[in-house]
């Protein structure tokens, strides 16, 4: 029953936090992240990241990306996939190189410095999606490019991570050799094509004929969670599966019914827990000891994604402000970077001495990113 009380506290606190944030013209997600900092070990210490909080937050981020997929215009995603490729590629090369360079400057072991760069290369677009949704700019060329780039980014980061682990430690994120892992992922994306084209429309049509309460919503959640599970199984982020599940269901005539119901479910319970869980990981006990390292690496984390995304978008003839908006949308690190950090620690590539400071770097860049994204979005869409 203890978790029920914790959940109640989180829901009340995030509602108040969102309200206060919006009153001051700040994205609501900032209020929810700060609630996590306040309630966690860095603040009052009332809530700790336990298994149930983790599971609820995982469902929250999956539902958030499912909603982003439902809201996305497939034709726009196809149209801006090419600029998304440029943005993702440069958004990985810049952080990996400058993350490694920063590690070398602080006299970190070479393998560990390389892993710093890989951690900074991971983008967690779920928080950016929340800002895009709040400002109603998901279905714009910038929003579609950010979403397309995040998909490519996730695939490339997984490949870089797999290769780096194999090269640096002789291990991998999967038990399979890299060529077989790539083949698995290729088949997964082939299955996504089949899902969008035929499977999802058939399943949603079947659900309409089932005499059971909320059969349509249940079927959509089965598709969402099933695709997330399969993505996780082959070494991709579960949010990639959720995003494409949303796109698949968005091609059916029950799209709006599914969106309204899943949005109510997600924002009532699971999504606030996800944003709070990010804030719960903050621990300021190591902050004063390594403040220079934390501040410089945070600056590197922000600038490399912003500039990499900017140059990638400029290659595709975006205006300067639009390109900066795309770059800003790629800054957030979130859960993907934390997962890579954990893998690095378990593989003895990240020393405990640097673990907490790196968590703080990831969380600081995640906290700052919505403000930067909102600023550049307002410059592009002033009205």
UniProtKB/Swiss-Prot annotation:
Localisation per UniProt entry: Cell membrane
Membrane topology: Multi-pass membrane protein
GO CC annotations on file: membrane; plasma membrane
Keyword Cell membrane: yes
Transmembrane segments: 1-21, 24-44, 51-71, 83-103, 112-132, 145-165, 186-206, 216-236, 262-282, 291-311, 323-343, 353-373
NCBIfam families, A to Z: 2a37
Family: Belongs to the monovalent cation:proton antiporter 2 (CPA2) transporter (TC 2.A.37) family.
The name this protein goes by in its record: Na(+)/H(+) antiporter
Organism: Enterococcus hirae
Lineage: Bacteria, Bacillati, Bacillota, Bacilli, Lactobacillales
């Amino acid at each position: 029953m203890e978790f029920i009380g914790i959940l109640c506290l989180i829901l009340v606190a995030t509602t108040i936090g969102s309200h206060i944030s919006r009153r001051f013209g700040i994205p609501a997600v900032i209020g929810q992240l700060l609630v996590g900092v306040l309630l966690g070990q860095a603040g009052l210490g009332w809530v700790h990241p336990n298994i149930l909080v983790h599971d609820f937050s995982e469902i929250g981020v999956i539902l958030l990306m499912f909603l982003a997929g439902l809201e996305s215009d497939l034709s726009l995603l196809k149209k801006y996939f090419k600029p998304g490729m440029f943005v993702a590629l440069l958004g990985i090369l810049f952080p990996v190189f400058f993350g490694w360079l920063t590690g070398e400057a602080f006299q970190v072991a070479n393998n560990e410095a390389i892993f710093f760069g890989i951690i900074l290369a991971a983008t967690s677009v779920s928080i950016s999606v929340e800002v895009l949704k709040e400002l109603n700019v998901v279905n714009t060329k910038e929003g579609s490019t950010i979403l397309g780039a995040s998909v490519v980014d996730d695939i490339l980061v997984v490949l870089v991570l797999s290769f780096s682990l194999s090269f640096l430690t002789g291990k991998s994120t999967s038990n399979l050799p890299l060529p077989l892992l790539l083949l698995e992922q290729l088949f997964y994306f082939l299955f996504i094509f089949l899902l969008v084209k035929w499977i999802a429309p058939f399943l949603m049509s079947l659900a309409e004929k089932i005499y059971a309460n909320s059969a349509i919503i249940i079927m959509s959640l089965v598709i969402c969670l099933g695709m997330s599970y399969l993505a996780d199984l082959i070494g991709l982020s579960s949010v990639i599966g959720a995003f494409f599940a949303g796109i698949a269901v968005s091609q059916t005539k029950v799209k709006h019914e599914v969106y309204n119901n899943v949005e109510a479910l997600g924002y009532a319970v699971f999504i606030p827990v996800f944003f709070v869980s990010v804030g719960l990981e903050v621990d300021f006990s190591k902050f004063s000891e390594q403040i220079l390292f934390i501040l410089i690496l945070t600056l590197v984390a922000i600038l490399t994604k912003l500039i990499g995304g900017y140059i990638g978008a400029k290659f595709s003839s975006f205006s300067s402000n639009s390109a900066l908006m795309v770059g800003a949308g790629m800054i957030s690190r979130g859960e993907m970077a934390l997962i890579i950090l954990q893998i690095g620690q378990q593989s003895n590539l990240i020393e405990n001495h640097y673990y907490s400071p790196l968590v703080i770097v990831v969380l600081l860049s995640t906290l700052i990113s919505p403000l930067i994204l909102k600023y550049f979005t307002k410059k592009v869409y002033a009205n």
